[in-house]
Amino acid sequence: HLNNYLQNQGYENTILYDPSGYDVNALTTVSDLKSVSTHLLEKQWFRDIVSKSNYTATLPDGSTQTWRNTNTFLDHTSEYYNENVKGIKTGSLSNDYNLVVLYQQHGKEFLICSLGSQSDSSRYDDVNYILKTIEITYNSI
C-alpha cells in the first residue's frame, strides 16, 4: 500500500519496505527527494518543525513528545552551525550518510541533496563545500 501511494503521488523511483524508510533495501532518487521536499516546503508547519534543533509536539491525549533534530547545522553548539540552514533531513543506511538541507541566502532558497557521504562529519563537510561555492559565486557577481 505504501509504495502504491508513493507512485500515485508521483514518486515513481522510491520503494520503501516500512514507513520509517530505514531498510537497506529502500530506494529513492535525488529527483524524488527534491519533489517531496519541495511539496512539503509549501507547508509552513513543516518549515517550522524542520528548522528547529528540538521540536515538542502536543499529542491528542494532551501529553507532549520532544524530538531532537540530528541536523547539526541547526545546533548552536556545533562547529557546523549555520544560521542560514533551515532543515531538512539527515539519513543514513549502512555506510552512506545523507543530508537534505534548505539554505536561505541572498534572497533565495537553495535545496541541497547530498547523498553517499562516507561519515557523519563528511556529510556536513560536503554540504559546507556547496554552501561556500554559493557564497563565492554570489560574491563574485
Residue ranges and their predicted role:
Residues 1-141:
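Penicillin-recognizing serine hydrolase domain
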